Amino acid sequence: MMLERIEAIERITGVLEDELVICNLGFPSRELYSIRDSPRHFYMLGSMGMASSIGLGLALSQERRVVVLDGDGSILMNLGGLVTAAAQSPGNLIIVLLDNRCYATTGSQCTYADVIDLGAVAESMGFNVIRFADDLNFEQALAMDGPVFAHVPVKPGNADVPVIDLDAEEIIERFIKEVRGATED
C-alpha cells in the first residue's frame, strides 16, 4: 500500500545516522521538522526546484553522506540540476524522489510525473536508481554507491503539521555549524 509522504519521510530519516538532509520546501520540510528536528536537517523555505542542486553542492564540499528529500514537481522544475549531479557523480549523494504526482505545497496541481518515468530519466543520466513500492527499506539505498536516485511513490496530500518555528537565520546557522563541525574533526 502506498505511503503518505510523512510516513515515507519518517521511515527514511528513522534509519539515518549522521547524514545531512536537504528537504524540499513547504509541507515536506514541515513534515520532517514535526517528525524529527535536527541541526543536520536543512529545511528549504523557498527556491522551489533547488533542493537537489543545494544537495549536490553540499555533497561536493565534504565527505559526509547527503540525502535530499525532493518532490516530483521540484525535480521537474530543475532537470538541469539532475544532469549536473550525474555529471559530477558524487558518491555521497542520495536524491530521494517523494513522488506524489502533484505540486502539493501550492494546491495539488498535477505534474507530468505520471507520464514521465523520472527513475528512467535519472538512470539515463548515470544515477544508480532504486525503486521502492510498498516496502520502503531505505537501508538498501544507503548501501548503494552514489550518486543514488531513490524513487518513492507517495499518496498526494499534506499532513496536518504546524509551520516550522525556526527562522531562516536559525536554520542556516545551526546547519552550517553542524557541517563545519563534521569537517573540522
Curated annotation (Swiss-Prot):
Gene Ontology molecular function: sulfopyruvate decarboxylase activity; thiamine pyrophosphate binding
Gene3D superfamilies named among the record's database cross-references: 3.40.50.970
Classification via InterPro entries: Sulfopyruvate_deCO2ase_bsu, THDP-binding, TPP_dependent_decarboxylase, TPP_enzyme_TPP-bd
Keyword annotations of the record: Coenzyme M biosynthesis, Decarboxylase, Lyase, Thiamine pyrophosphate
Record pathway: Cofactor biosynthesis; coenzyme M biosynthesis; sulfoacetaldehyde from phosphoenolpyruvate and sulfite: step 4/4
Organism: Methanothermobacter thermautotrophicus (strain ATCC 29096 / DSM 1053 / JCM 10044 / NBRC 100330 / Delta H) (Methanobacterium thermoautotrophicum)
The protein's name in its UniProt record: Sulfopyruvate decarboxylase subunit beta
Coiled coil stretches, renumbered: none
Protein's UniProt keywords contain Lyase: yes
